[in-house]
Design a protein with these regions (language model features):
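Short alpha-helical segments that sit at the start of domains
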Residues: 1-29
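Short acidic, hydrophobic short linear motifs in intrinsically disordered regions
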Residues: 29-39
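Short helix-coil junctions and helix-kink-helix linkers
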Residues: 37-47
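Key DNA-contact positions within bacterial/archaeal DNA-binding proteins
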Residues: 50
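Short, hydrophobic-biased segments on the C-terminal half of alpha helices
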Residues: 53-57
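A short, conserved structural fragment
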Residues: 60-70
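Short, cationic-aromatic polyanion-contact patches
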Residues: 70-89
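Amphipathic alpha-helical dimerization/coiled-coil segments
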Residues: 88-125
């Protein structure tokens, strides 16, 4: 698993992904309260600050975020860009499901999309 500096990129849980996606969608340094508010609004959650704080701490530990402390105020800065994570997840998906063959993946994806698009369509004579 190669990342930006040759380090291992850790997997995100579903909850961590929601918090991280919220931060990626607002690419500026954010405080806990804003992250909590936007995550709850976006994903229909009712997470309290302690819950979101726990997820953020895990994201910092996994190397996705950096905490910047100024007195009692902390903001969080993105370290791993969204595109880097998407590329890594896509690479792992193709490697696992299609033995690393992008062509095989695209063929399967095209067939599924084409079949789904043609369901219920009657041929006209």
């Amino acid at each position: 698993m190669l990342t930006m500096k040759g380090e291992n990129m850790e997997e995100l849980t579903t909850a961590e992904s929601m918090v991280m996606k919220t931060i990626w969608d607002h690419p500026y340094e954010m405080a806990l309260q804003e992250i909590m508010k936007l995550t709850n609004e976006t994903y229909g959650k009712d997470w309290k600050s302690q819950t979101v704080s726990t997820y953020i701490a895990k994201l910092v530990k996994k190397g996705f975020l950096r905490m910047n402390q100024s007195g009692r105020n902390a903001t969080y800065e993105i370290i791993i860009p969204e595109l880097s994570y998407q590329q890594e997840q896509s690479r792992k998906f193709v490697k696992f499901w299609n033995r690393g063959s992008v062509a095989q993946f695209l063929t399967a994806f095209y067939k599924e999309t084409y079949q789904r698009g043609n369901r219920g369509v009657e041929k006209k004579h």
